[in-house]
């Protein structure tokens, strides 16, 4: 049983504390009895402005900060990301990465995690936006801004039955992200954040590039920043883009044996060139691109086998409410 316990958390969000913030000293006193046990402790942070005061108190810090149609500690109308136009129904999705990096650096060497925004039937209408959960693209980019910082666990808020039935179009995208995480997990767990760079085009955000490197290889991420708020639908819109991404490589990866793109369908060929401690990847990206660099041959084959194994496991349930109407109807009938 013990290896299956992720962490002990009983304080919720101490920065809010049900209306009364719990002081850091009091948080430490409540967590201290666990110091002599094998159970790691966890705290859900919620406000970047003061989470430095809680740094180092728990074994597994994480946070929640949803970027569309949800309560938030930051004032969305103050962001001037899009030519000075402000919106009240969402915030720049890349602020997820900003906050993950902040939490990571404040709490080193502790591993960090993130509550990623998923379907939820309890959020209200914000700023006139009718859709009260993220779109599939909004879900994917929020998750990958977090993953690219080398979080070691991602939690979805929330996967209640009512929420999944209310937003059926999110079941498939979440399943794909989950499968990709399982493909990447060893690289994330054994590696560390290596490089982060934001690229601008004509002075505007263009790409967030990040890498995680470790003994068996590197993960490279290219997150698209040219999405725009649609004034009618009040959702963020994306389009596929061509890009050439330059990533620095540590010495042991300077002559990679394998470079490939990765997604839920497994490894794919990608155009690249390597030299002078860098790799340049040319690809067409929709929302987020994931790439793998390996110092020796064999990782691609292992990932292909792992993808097939994960797919067989998913299919073994013979239940696919995302793709089959009959299965979705069975899911819907479970509602009270």
Predicted regions, residues:
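Intrinsic-disorder-associated interaction segments
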Residues: 89, 167-170, 174-177, 296, ...
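Glycan-processing catalytic domains of CAZymes
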Residues: 1-257, 265-293
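Histidine-centered catalytic/metal-binding microenvironments
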Residues: 318-336
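C-terminal beta-strand-rich structural cap/linker in extracellular carbohydrate-active enzymes
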Residues: 275-318
């Amino acid at each position: 049983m013990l290896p299956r316990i992720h962490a002990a958390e009983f304080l919720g969000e101490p920065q809010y504390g049900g209306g009364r913030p719990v002081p850091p000293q009091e948080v430490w006193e409540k967590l201290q009895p666990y110091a002599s046990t094998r159970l790691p402790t966890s705290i859900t942070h919620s406000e970047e402005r003061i989470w430095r005061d809680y740094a180092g108190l728990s074994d597994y810090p994480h946070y929640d900060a949803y970027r569309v149609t949800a309560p938030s500690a930051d004032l969305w109308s103050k962001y001037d990301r899009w030519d000075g136009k402000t919106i009240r129904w969402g915030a720049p999705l890349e602020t997820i990465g900003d906050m993950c990096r902040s939490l990571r650096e404040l709490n080193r060497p502790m591993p960090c995690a993130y509550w990623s925004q998923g379907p939820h039937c309890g959020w209200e209408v914000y700023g006139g936006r009718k859709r009260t959960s993220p779109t599939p693209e909004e879900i994917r980019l929020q998750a990958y801004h977090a993953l690219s910082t080398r979080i070691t666990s991602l939690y979805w808020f929330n996967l209640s039955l009512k929420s999944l039935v209310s937003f059926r179009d999110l079941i498939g995208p979440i399943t794909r992200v989950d499968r990709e995480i399982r493909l990447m997990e060893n690289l994330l767990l054994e590696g560390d954040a290596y490089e982060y760079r934001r690229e601008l085009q004509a002075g505007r955000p263009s790409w967030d590039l990040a890498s995680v490197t470790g003994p068996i290889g590197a993960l490279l991420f290219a997150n698209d920043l040219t999405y725009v708020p649609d004034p009618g639908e009040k959702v963020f819109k994306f389009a596929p883009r061509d890009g050439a991404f330059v990533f620095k490589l540590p010495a042991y990866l300077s002559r990679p044996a394998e470079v490939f793109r990765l997604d839920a369908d497994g490894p794919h060929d990608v155009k690249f060139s390597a030299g002078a401690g860098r790799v340049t990847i040319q690809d067409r990206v929709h929302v987020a691109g994931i790439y793998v660099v390996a110092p020796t041959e064999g990782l691609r084959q292992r990932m292909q086998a792992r993808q097939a194994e994960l797919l067989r496991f998913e299919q073994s349930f013979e239940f696919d409410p995302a793709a089959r109407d009959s299965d979705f109807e069975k899911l819907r009938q479970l509602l009270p």
